[in-house]
């Protein structure tokens, strides 16, 4: 599957533009070409950041996707586009949450994607979510998602990817779902291994910052406000207490996943802590 034309792109659940940034890097490095024609995001501050980072003039501002998809006519008026991307809300599938899946309103956002897909029929779809989506509810949730896409006429492939395999030194597993209206060649492979091989082949001509370990990323001069106090340090670095046992480790070359509750300062078995000596090393 070789695509040489400019692809029209719409980004759903855009946040501050994760997919868009990737598309822009591919364009900058002359690997692929994209034109962004619209985006949806409900968080006001995320939208402010998105508009500050990108030139969104003449793009469709879809806003709240629930409200937007209430009108088939409104969906139909979207400009035609080739690629739909979206990291739909993951809290209802995450191992860190209650895992209510489709029983939570946020878990139903996938079906708002399908509302757009059934009207606009974009040739390509790329969706992202937490690894646990793949196994949630004994895989019934994931199977439903794949079946919905197939029922809309799409060929669907998927795999689980880890950021540390792509020169981003953090353990962060995500399931990526690729769907296309085009027939897939018999030799088409969509897997973490195949994509990693493609990345390795192209990375020398990619301008994105790359690092195999956190040493290449951590700032050398760290403000005092980020230092652990002597009072809290023994607790955070301890291997456990009466009701909680753990193996606390600092100076991880590959960072642990970031969590929404990390600001609460978990123990060193969960969060990422680094010594000044480690930061200063090469």
Show the residue positions of the predicted features.
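Alpha-helix termination/capping residues and helix-transition junctions
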Residues: 3, 31-33, 53, 78, ...
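Extreme N-terminus of proteins, especially the signal/transit-peptide cleavage junction
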Residues: 1-7
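Residue-level signal for beta-strand positions within conserved beta-sheet cores that form or flank
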Residues: 5, 32-35, 154, 173
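The start of beta-strands in P-loop NTPase/AAA+ ATPase cores
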Residues: 6, 36, 58-59, 82, ...
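Class I S-adenosyl-L-methionine
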Residues: 71-81, 91-281
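SAM cofactor-binding core of SAM-dependent methyltransferases
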Residues: 7-66
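Non-cysteine beta-strand/loop elements that form the S-adenosyl-L-methionine
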Residues: 85-87
